[in-house]
Amino acid sequence: MESNNSILGTTEMASSVEVRELLPFKTLTELNNALDNGLTDLPITCIAESVDYVYRGSEISAQKILLEKVDRDEQPRTLVCHDMKGGYLEDRFLSGSTSHDSYIFYHWSVVDIFVYFSHHFVTVPPCGWINAAHHHGVKVLGTVITEGNNDTWNTILISQEDVKKFADALILVAKCYQFEGWLLNIENKIKQEDIDNLIYFVKYLTENIHKEIENSEIIWYDSVTNIGELNWQNELNDNNKDFFLHCDGIFLNYNWTESRLSKSRIFAKELGRDIKDIYVGLDVWGRGCPGGGGFNSTYALDLIRKQGLSVAIFAPGWTHEYFGPSTFQILEDLFWAQLFPYLYVHVPIYEDETFKTSFCRGAGICYYYNGEEHFELYKINDESAHGKKAFYNLRMQQPQLSVPAPHSQFTRATQRTLIEDGENNDEVNNGQGDKDNDTNKTHTRIERIYENRKNIIRVCDNVVNVEEKLSAPDFNTFEFCDQFSYNGGGCLKLITTNDRLYHRLFLIHIDLKHNIQATIVYTELGSLMNESHKDPVLILGNDGDLKSILPYNSIRVNARWRKCIYLTNLKTVDEIGVSLKQCDCYLGEIILEKRDHCFEKTVVGNER
C-alpha cells in the first residue's frame, strides 16, 4: 500500500473481499501528499447533542431512585486515552473484520473526550471509534506525537508560515473526518530557538480549529518544557504554563503526587484558568502512577477528584490486553464499576428522533437480524457451504447502557503471597536452565482477592478466576449475553430476584411532538417450549416521576422472541427502565418513537 498517496489503503480479509483500511500518517511527507491528492470522504456520524446537566455516578452506584441533576460545566471531566497494542488493529478496517473478540469500548456515558492514541506521527481515529463515540455524545481527538530522535519539528518550526501550514493541515484532517481536535504529545527535545514558534503553533492551531470545528479541543501533553527539554513535570508549573495558556487543556504525566496536584490547582487559579482544564494522567498499567493502576485505579482517581481536577484515563484496554479476550467482558465491567462513583453520566438528546437499541456492542460470534442468524456463503474445497459469520465493526455499535452492572463495586480487597516450588513451577522455569540449580528455589507471586455482592474474583498475574457466591442474591442485576441476539451481536440478560425493584437502563432526554409509543423485544429461555410468559413492565421517568406501563399488545415474533407494544401519554422522557417478575429475561431491543397512526385514537389506560 502506498500510504503517501492516501490515508486509505486496501487489505484482504478472510472472506477474500477487498476492503479499505484507515491508517495514520507516519511522516510529514505522507501527510502533505495525502492533502495534495485530496482526502477521501468517510461514513462519519455527527456528534449527538447532550443536555447541560449530568448525574453523579456515586448516586447511580448507590442505587438511588431519585437522581439529582447537576450542572455539567461545573463538574470535572473524564478523558479516555486509547492505547491498545499500538493501535490500528482490527479497528482500522472500514468494513470491519471477523475478529469478534477484539477490543471494544462501551462505557461512553461517563466519558467526555475520547483520544485515539498510537505511536505514529499523525494518528487519525478510525471511523468506527468516531461513530461509536459520536452516537453517545462524546468528543473524539486524534494524536500528534513525536518521540526519540525524531527531527520533524525542526522542519515544522522553521518559520511561522511553516507552522501555519502544518496547523492548517491538522485542522483540515479533523474537519474532513469530523472529529473534534488533537492531543499534542511531543516527546523529544526541541531546539531552544524554536520554542517561540512551538508556542505560536499551539496558539494558532487552537484559535483556528475553534473557528472551523464547533466545540473543538486542543490538549497539550506534559512532556517538553518551555526551554525545549524533554522533562515530564507531573504538575502544572512555570515550565509548561506557556503551552497550557494557549490551548484548551493539559494532560499531566502519571508520576504526580497529591501535593503536586494541589500546587497545580492553585497555579491554574492564579493564571485565571479553569482547574477542570487540567487532565491528570491515570495510567491503568500503573507505571509510576499512585495506587499502581489496575483494579486499584480508584486510589488515584479519588485523589484527583478531591482536588476538583479532570482525569485522563490512559490505556483502559488493560482489561483486554493483559488478561486476554476470554475474561474481557467481566473484567471490563468490574473495572469501570469501581471508577463509576467518581464519574458523571452525561445525557444525550433525542429531539423528534427515535431512540432504538439492540444493545449490540459492535461485535459478535454471529450477526442476527430480526432474531434470525445471518449466514455467509463460503467456498471449502470448491464446495459451497454456509456458516455463521462473526464480526467486529464499531460502526455497528448500538446505544449503550448509561449505568454500570449493579452491585459490582468491591466490598472487600485482600491479597496473599503464593510460594511455589521451583521444581514444580513449569510456568516459571519453562523447562529451561539447569534443573539441579532450580529445584531448591522458591518463587513467590501475589494473589489479589476482590469481593462484591455477587462474586469473589482472584487475580494472580494475568490469570483470573471468578467464583459466584454461594448465597442466593437478594438484588437485581444484569449482564451482557453474546450467545444470541435479536439484532446485531448480543442482548441484555436481566436477572431479577426482587420484583419490587426495577432495572434502570438508560438516562437520556427524549422529547417528541407526539405521544410516545415503545417496543420491547424479549425472551425468557424457560418459556421457549410453551406459551407461558411474563411480559416486562416498561418504566419511563420524567423529571423524577416514574411511570409503570403495561403492554398494550404482545405477540410472538418467532420461536424465541416476543414483542410488546406500549402506549403512553408522555412526550418527554429522561429515564428508561424495565420491571420483571422473578426470572432471567433477555432484552433484544428497545424502541421509543412517536405513536403509530393506527393507535392515535387509542385511550391509554395501562399506566400505573
Regions inferred by a protein language model and the residue ranges of each:
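N-terminal module-boundary/linker segments of secreted carbohydrate-active enzymes
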Residues: 2-89
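Extra-cytoplasmic beta-strand recognition segments
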Residues: 114, 423, 462, 492, ...
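Substrate-binding cleft of secreted/luminal carbohydrate-active enzymes
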Residues: 284-421
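Chitinase-like catalytic core of GlcNAc-active glycosidases
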Residues: 71-263
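Extracellular carbohydrate recognition and processing domains
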Residues: 544-571
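Exposed low-complexity, polar/acidic, P/S/T/G-rich flexible segments that act as propeptides
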Residues: 583-607
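Short carbohydrate-recognition loop motifs
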Residues: 474-502
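Short, surface-exposed beta-strand/strand-loop-strand elements in extracellular ectodomains
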Residues: 530-543
